[in-house]
């Protein structure tokens, strides 16, 4: 199996830009993601907007609020990723909050992320205490 994330770090350093999906719109987000890859991104972090982005600074907090005010939903982000994945080959990783995943449904979120072509997820507010040993 091909591991795009592992390949992104094959040469040690990687350029990893971030964008909040839906700010200013999902259509613009798609174009920005494509340009990020064209300009050398090795991996791209896609922020799923959340109403209480406590781990973010004021700029990304404001981007989350603008995206949500514009009607962005997790389902719409998945649909956008499906479209962009047809042309973007670098790894795509969601950066969002645990509540987004939990309220959506863990299994449903994972299935939709895989179907859309996502390579991973970062949940900065999920404590390791919540992780059980296999």
Each PLM stretch: what is its role?
Residues 17, 47, 113:
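Conserved, mostly hydrophobic/aromatic
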Residues 129-134:
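Residue-level detector of conserved catalytic or cofactor/ligand-binding positions
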Residues 1-16:
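N-terminal amphipathic alpha-helix/helix-capping segment at the start of soluble metabolic enzymes
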Residues 70-71, 118-128:
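Catalytic beta/alpha-barrel core
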Residues 15-28, 93-105:
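Active-site mouth loops of central-metabolism enzymes
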Residues 27-35, 103-112:
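Short, acidic/polar
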Residues 45-72:
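Glycine-rich, proline-tolerant flexible connector loops at the mouths of alpha/beta enzymes
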């Amino acid at each position: 199996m091909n591991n795009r994330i592992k390949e992104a770090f094959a040469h040690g350093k990687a350029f990893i830009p971030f964008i909040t999906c839906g700010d200013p719109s999902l259509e613009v987000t798609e174009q920005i993601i494509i340009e990020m890859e064209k300009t050398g991104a090795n991996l791209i972090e896609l922020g799923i907007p959340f109403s209480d982005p406590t781990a973010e600074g004021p700029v990304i907090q404001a981007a989350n609020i603008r995206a949500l005010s514009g009607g962005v939903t997790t389902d719409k982000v998945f649909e956008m990723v499906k479209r962009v994945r047809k042309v973007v080959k670098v790894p795509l990783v969601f950066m969002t909050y645990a509540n987004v995943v939990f309220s959506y449904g863990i299994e449903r979120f994972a299935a939709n992320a895989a179907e859309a072509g996502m390579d991973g997820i970062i949940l900065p507010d999920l404590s390791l205490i919540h992780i059980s040993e296999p």
